Amino acid sequence: IDFEAEYQNQEELITTDLARGNTYKKILCAAFDTALLQFYSQNSFYKFVYHDGVLDSLDIRKKEKYIEYVREIANKSNIQYILTVIESETHDLRSEYKFTEDEVRLILSDVSCEDKLFEHCF
C-alpha cells in the first residue's frame, strides 16, 4: 500500500518538517497497523502486531502518549502488542508509563550467550 501523509501544525494547517522525518513515518506505520487490527478485531483476523524500535529517538512526551494509546487499544480490542525497546529509551518515562512485569515477556542482553535470543555467541 502506498500513501502520502503529511504532518500539519494545528493552527495554520501548513506542512511541517516533521513530515519528512523517519520517526514520524515509523509512528504513522505503527498507528496504521494498530488501527487495522482494531477495525478487524471482531473478525477472524490477526490478533497481534509486532513493531521493532517504534519508540527509538522519539520525544519523551510522544513515547508516553504512544504507550498510553497502545495500552488502550490492546485492552479494548483484545490485541497482543509486541514491541522491542532498548532499555535506555525508557529511562525518562514517568512511572505510570514504565512497563510492568506483566507487560514484559523477554529481556535480552549481550552480557552472556544465555541472555541472547538464540542463546548462541558468534
Predicted ranges, named:
Residues 20, 39-43, 73-77:
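Conserved catalytic network of the ASCE P-loop NTPase/AAA+ motor domain
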Residues 1-20, 40:
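Extended helical coiled-coil dimerization/tether regions that scaffold
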Residues 7, 25, 48-50, 64:
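Structured extramembrane domains adjacent to transmembrane segments
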Residues 52-54:
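Walker B catalytic acidic pair
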Residues 59-60:
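Conserved D-loop-proximal element of ABC-family nucleotide-binding domains
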Residues 65-122:
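C-terminal lobe/lid and adjacent interdomain/linker elements of RecA-like ASCE P-loop ATPase modules
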